[in-house]
Amino acid sequence: MTETKNADAGSVITDHVTLRYDYAIGEVAGRFMQGLKDGKILATRCSKSGLTYLPPRSYCERSFEKCDSWVEAGLEGVIETSTIVVRGFEGMRKAPVAIAFVRLDGTDSAIANYVDGLDLTNYETAMKRIAPGRRVRVEFAKAREGRITDFSFVCVD
């Protein structure tokens, strides 16, 4: 008979795991990502409710009807909420980074992305620049790949 020894409750196994994950993004996200590659921010619209969604959605949350058209969102908008992330994540931008949810002109929902061009050495000053209600504009990357990182926001004022 083999004796099994249980690990102590406080034991930790340290390992490094790298996973590759491929997934189908679907029709709506696919068209949105192609728009980004083409230098456009595309949103879906529901003619029944009159709502315009960004990120685009297949169905309207108000009418429960299929969103039936695509529109190009404005390239400026207002910050709904924001934060400064001070702890980095592997494979992502080096911290600190500013992130904001922005309602672009002509849309009824907000999309999150990085806010570039800020001096993040003074968090208090930076947070005032990205406070709710402040205006930002979209800035596209020179080389676009059809990913959410193809654009970021920069402060207008």
Range-by-range predicted roles:
Residues S47-G50, S63-F64, T107:
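Short Cys/His-rich metal-coordination motifs, predominantly Zn2+-binding knuckles/fingers
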Residues D119-R137:
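Short nucleic-acid-contacting surface segments enriched for D/E, G, S/T with interspersed K/R
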Residues M1-I41, D150:
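A broadly conserved sequence feature marking short terminus-proximal activation segments
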Residues S82-G88, T107, A143:
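Short, conserved beta-turn/loop elements at beta-strand boundaries and strand-helix junctions
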Residues K40-A43, G50, R57:
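Residues immediately within or flanking Cys/His clusters that coordinate Zn2+
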Residues E139-D157:
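OB-fold/S1-family single-stranded nucleic acid-binding modules
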Residues M92-I111:
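OB-fold (S1/OB) nucleic-acid-binding surfaces
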Residues G77-I79:
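Conserved hydrophobic positions within beta-strands
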